[in-house]
Amino acid sequence: MVTRCVREAALLAWVVLWMLSTRVGTLLLCGRLSFSGAAGESPSVRRFADMPLERREATLQRWNRTRWLFPLRIVFTLVKILSHYVFYAMVNEKSQNPHWNAIGYRVEEWREEQAEPLAPAHARSRPLDSGVVETRALNDTTLLRSLADRGLAAKPGSSDAHHTVQCDAVIVGSGCGGGVAAAMLASSGYKVVVIEKGDYFTADDYSSIEGPSMERLFERGGIFCTSNVTTMLFTGATVGGGSAVNWSACIRTPGEVLQEWSREHGLPLFASPGYEQAMDAVCTRLGVTDGCLQEGFQNKVLRRGCEALGLPVDAVPRNSSDGHYCGSCNFGCPTGDKRGTDTTWLADAVNRGAVVLTGCKADRFILESNSGKNGRSKKCVGLLATCLSNGITKKLHIQAKVSISACGALMTPPLLRSSGLKNRHIGRNLHLHPVSMAWGYFPENKQGAPITGKSYEGGIITSMHRVTERTIIETPALSPGGFAAMVPWESGRDMKERMRQFARTAHAFALVRDRGAGFVDCEGRLRFTPNRDDTRELRHGLRRVLRILVAAGAAEVGTHRSDGLRLWCKGVRDEDLEAFLDEVTIEKGPMHSTTDKWALFSSAHQMGSCRMGSSSKDGAVDGRGESWEAEGLYVCDGSLLPTAVGVNPMITIQSLAYCLSKDIAQSLAYGKKH
């Protein structure tokens, strides 16, 4: 709880749990429900653990609905999410969970399908073996030896100094931006060092098991909430970053978005032929395919519902083969078919001499006075980083001609601030593509033409419906723990019934290109609340999702609102459906006390927190990605985007990184000549 929650929420939960262990505290928090005693006897107060089950349940229901005592609602939310997640996601020493059979869930065993047995793990080569240095298993001596073996000039530090490493370019982060930048610079002949906080895994390491996979592949173990408790965030923290755990959607930057960024934000790059060529190059390197031979259950539901309503539905390109039927790519693709930066751009980089340091966290960029040269008062000369191994006692001082922050929209702003940068746009303008979900239950024995499959099978996103210019509908990846954490809790019995229907419950979500902006306050703390316009778009999109689910033949549909809003669809009339849809609302998080209903948004896309601008008044960096304050310091990740892009942003981020790193390579070449 402490590692996955904001400090205040964890402290609040601790206080409430302590109070519930006492009679006085239970009386204060539970009121009359804590009383016991037979008729005619004086009532006594029980501790929460001694209360009858039905009274404990009634207490939680009261906390869920309380309007003014929102701290109790926050504790309810926290306990509900974590307890259900742990119950359904965690496994024993045999990688099994005894509850999965009851809900119709099983983990796909992809390796059983291979014709030949795999070689032992130590005998198999990995795409990055020639360039990766996994520091968690090293000490000071073996670290320096590993760096030297990979062609880096590394000097040991004295008793109180840092180890010094020399290179041409240091890149913090190995995801969509950092991976592309590393490949482009290394292919131009420069010595590149990539710093990655997470660890390196390949297809052979991915288990598709929710609990362990979330723990080692995602920031904060995959349970990461905004500090104002409005949005659950999912962001990769491994080699390959988000590209290793995303849902494979490869959608080009929409033309109207490119025009907006060029005209309204004064960034001509986005209207240039070079950017279009970059998108072509990125899609080619990722092996993007446009079709899907067999869709999974949820996408079949989305497609059937759209077709029944006469709505357009588009096939979503993916960075995998058209026959890819993996439903667990969000835990790293166990088939190796999905092509993230860890198997493409980073492989290109290490083949050209780049070195990737895993288990290594950037502390700050090293800035020196620049005497106002080029309008920048500072110059970046490298990076200070800490290896997370207990055996490595000294920090790394990486000297570089060019330094690039590519650790994502949540981590780049704190890194730049800790380095001494002051631009007011650093950490502002955060966009999250907030998502609101709806669900539909499709019994297997339904008459007619049933939709076959289970909710966790098949490609995660293969179909998309565009509601408006700003809102799209897609399907999510929800394994048992995530499903249980996010669906409403009304009672213990109701929750069991929801989980019993897990395998045949299809989810779809409305995603909005948000205009409201959040703030990254520091590492691990951010605030976000959609504005009214975003909320209207989300409500319109969520209502459309429900119509699609009903049209697809769902027996029951509902939303994730805390009161469990739902509709039984058998024999439903048009007027009944419209009345139900009129009840659909987009609620804020449990901290907001204006209503007894609440909901959480979800976000897998974070953008804009160090946006590009035509001047220092408009953005944190210039149109080349270079800091307005420090020469030689660049940003090359999703935080650059001027606004939300409105679709899955992987292709946009990689294409932008392609253009910027190509320009950085040319700048380095120019510096050599002059």
Regions found by a protein language model. Give the residues of each.
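Flexible, low-complexity segments enriched for small/polar residues
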Residues: M1-E108
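Rossmann-like flavin
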Residues: F48, E54-F76, F87, V239, ...
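Conserved redox-cofactor binding core of oxidoreductases
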Residues: I81, Y88, N97-R150, A154, ...
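N-terminal Rossmann-like FAD-binding beta1-loop-alpha1 element of flavoenzymes
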Residues: Q166-V194
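Glycine-rich loop(s) and the adjacent beta-strand/alpha-helix scaffold that form part
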Residues: M184-G211, M232, T238, N351, ...
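N-terminal FAD cofactor-binding segment of flavoenzymes
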Residues: Y190, K197-E256, N299-E307
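FAD cofactor-binding and catalytic pocket of flavoenzymes
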Residues: N423-V550, E556, R566, D596, ...
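A conserved FAD-binding loop/helix module that cradles the flavin
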Residues: T643-K662
